[in-house]
Design a protein with these regions (language model features):
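Short active-site loop/helix that positions an aromatic residue
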Residues: 77-89
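Long, compositionally biased stretches
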Residues: 2-68, 95-159
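Internal catalytic-core helix/loop-beta-alpha segment
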Residues: 73, 83, 101
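Compact, glycine-rich, soluble single-domain proteins
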Residues: 64-65, 72-77
């Protein structure tokens, strides 16, 4: 099996079931067209989008519904065509498509979610886009408050 190098996970197998393709790349990362969507039970519901060509490029994301349960996903006809979605129906988030908010962790510890430009993935063919909304309803810096780590999962100091 082919392996890819990553900054945070070392070498990992290239699992085609986790592969997400961005036909046009991501804004500012147009050459990055293939990512692994890595989920781990310890960090659920967090999703890591790891580039398969650039080891140091890994985006953190959360399902939009985890950030804003009332989020209204809009997908244009052009975006539907790129994703390979039916042009006549509007898929709600988390059914035909997965909608993810990219997460930013600032040096000062602030954490925010980009609700203005969600990553939208067609679950059937694993094609994805970053859909930019210009309607002003959502921010690219929606503040997040991280829950405290559960007491039973905190690592104990060595004795």
């Amino acid at each position: 099996m082919v392996e890819i190098k990553t900054k945070y996970f070392g070498s990992i197998p290239l699992d085609s079931g986790l592969l997400v393709e961005f036909p046009s790349g991501l804004p500012a990362f147009e050459r990055e067209q293939a990512f692994l969507a890595i989920e781990h039970p310890r960090t659920a519901p967090l999703v890591m989008l790891q580039s398969i060509t650039t080891p140091d490029l890994c985006f953190l994301a959360l399902p939009i519904s985890e950030v804003d349960p009332d989020y209204q996903l809009l997908i244009s006809a052009e975006e539907r065509a790129v994703l390979g979605l039916d042009q006549t129906t509007d898929p709600p988030a988390n059914t035909d498509v997965a909608a993810l908010a990219l997460i930013a962790v600032r040096q000062d510890g602030r954490v925010s979610a980009n609700l203005m430009s969600p990553v939208v993935v067609n679950r059937a063919n694993r094609r994805a886009i970053q859909s930019v909304r210009w309607d002003g309803l959502y921010s690219h810096e929606h503040p997040l408050r991280l829950p405290p780590a559960p007491a039973d999962t905190q690592e104990q100091p060595c004795s």
